[in-house]
């Protein structure tokens, strides 16, 4: 099955065919750097990171551009609130952004342009639109003329007559039409000198100018959250088509919302959790797994229960991985004939690719990984007749599927250690006390002092410690 993507522009799944063979140009709208990123931002970052990883897995050379909006009224307001320079606000929250992305194992894009480094490109684009009578200057502002673009509404499906009827309540005397939007806004400091007077760029022109510079007049994929379809991406199409006469993007891809109590998580509604808040209580990889457990276009419900469930799933994944690696530790995988070919033809690899080729259906892909984990655990226990070679091939197929999803970037031991540290922050348990009780239970069992063994076990249970007796001793972890 060839790769199929749902194109917001055509409202259907389409076979993905890039402009250039084995090359992909992808632009994703980044964050406005005035605050810490929330879980909604995490979802967008993880979704398009997974696209990036899967395209590379398929053998594409990907030029991935993700921008920073580093000039905006919100940034200036935050600078005033904190009593610092607006550029210091940028530095602070860009650094925080990179910290958050690192925790979530987000791969670095090819290019990460900042809006303020591309003012000249915006000037050039705005002037081109003015020269073609598709934009006009009005008292220091420059507006895009909606009437100059007959296809306005093609992405969102909105009717321009309905929009105009709704826009008449907010009259701006500077505009020829209430729907016209700003390309350049006259402003107080900070501002840039321009042919139209001092001011700042409009939000929409920033992305059009940067995507054009780094990916050309037309490129393969433009991504972002569903909330950007209108007006941001609709306006990008209008600007870019107006400037070049070409549709700027072949496939528009949008991820669904993260919801809390059936409402979109957002700063404007005040119902958001920052990535760093969540990662104090849950492992960052748990958050990543949770956010890819649903199809990227579907809404996903954020709740403690869902994160607890994701923790259990990821712990089970790492436990299975540890067992399989231990089972094949002494096997030289390189000596297995056609090892990589066998991995490529393994049933998990085939099912995983089929799911991912169906509009990047990570939910189904993870269901296949769950199924294969059960098979792998059975094989590790010596049941089912699987050879060590079979286990090694299945393990590698499973690892590669996880890598595409951005999972398993730690060893099982590292994951368990970090998970314990996160869970123990609130409980502040004494590890030496836990080890002492486990040793005491072991001694009591050897002496057949069952009452004492039960007492040690009960005390561990009260502490929230789960124990498991294995041939190699007693393993433990926190609930």
Task: Please provide the spans of the model-predicted regions.
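Alpha-helical recognition segments enriched in aromatics with Gly/Pro capping
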Residues: 1-34, 49, 120-325
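N-terminal, positively charged nucleic-acid-binding surface of large information/translation enzymes
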Residues: 10-13, 19-105, 143, 469-476
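Anion (oxyanion) recognition and catalysis
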Residues: 56, 130, 461
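Short phosphate-binding/catalytic loops that engage adenosine nucleotides
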Residues: 60, 134, 465
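Short, glycine/charge-rich beta-strand/loop segments that flank catalytic centers
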Residues: 68-72, 94-97, 107-122, 140-149
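Short, polar/flexible loop-turn hinges at active-site or ligand-entry regions and domain interfaces
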Residues: 82-88, 109, 297-301
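Structural preference for alpha-helix termini/caps and helix-kink/transition segments
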Residues: 264, 272-479
